Amino acid sequence: MRFCIRDGAKRQKKRGTAAMSFLPDDVIDTAEIAGSNYINVGTLLPFFKDALPEIAYKLHKNGKTWVLDPVAAGIGKTRTAILESFRTYPPTIVRGNASEIIALDAMWGLAQHDSTVPGTRPAGVEAVDEVDSAVDAAKRVARHLAKYSPVGAGAVAVSGAVDLVTDGERVFRLPGGSAMMTKITGAGCSLGGVTATYLAVAEPLVAAISASLLYNRASEIAEAKSSGPGSFQVTLLDALWNVTAEEVAASEIIID
């Protein structure tokens, strides 16, 4: 089950059996039988301000794993209030761009004693910070997730020119992928859904790395077969379906 509130990403979930809902009671009931869950704050409705914190609490209370995509963290009072509330009942994995991770780290007060933290200006849905600028923030957030995780571990995935995944201690860099991913809508949001699919069957760090590698390989294949953003988006779906485990396993992983 994914509680995904980014309309443009709905059609891009592949290989997982997804149930998507805007209704809090439906989400909470469905979570009981779900392997993992996904909350995306990309498109908000007024009642989400109360509904999403309630859902996070129920997931935590019932020991359910879930993935958060903090889309446009730092923009708007409602989105900020929702994301701040997740500090108490946090997700198992956070997936976002560098600016979103830095903003979430600041919102949760994890960076208050770190004078090296970049400015926490709102960045919208596009990153204005490099992945390297988010390393410390990502590690702090991952350690915070692990404290509350029903499986005793958490992970943060930072998307960028070279993706980064950390469990709070170890840092993995994942070269590759396609710059065309930044030219279409819903790519990051659908990656969150795929991450949740992996989280249903793997520990958080493995799930976050596997999903990111899958998307990197598929996007490379799609770019080679497409002529622009429109054809790339369609070809990416086919590539996600057809990419093999061997192709993903051959990916380069750099350990800091």
Task: Label each PLM-derived region with a short phrase.
Residues 138-146, 204-219, 236-237:
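Short, well-structured alpha-helical segments that form the helix of a local strand-helix-strand
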Residues 174-186:
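Short pre-catalytic strand/loop immediately N-terminal to key active-site residues, enriched for Gly-Thr
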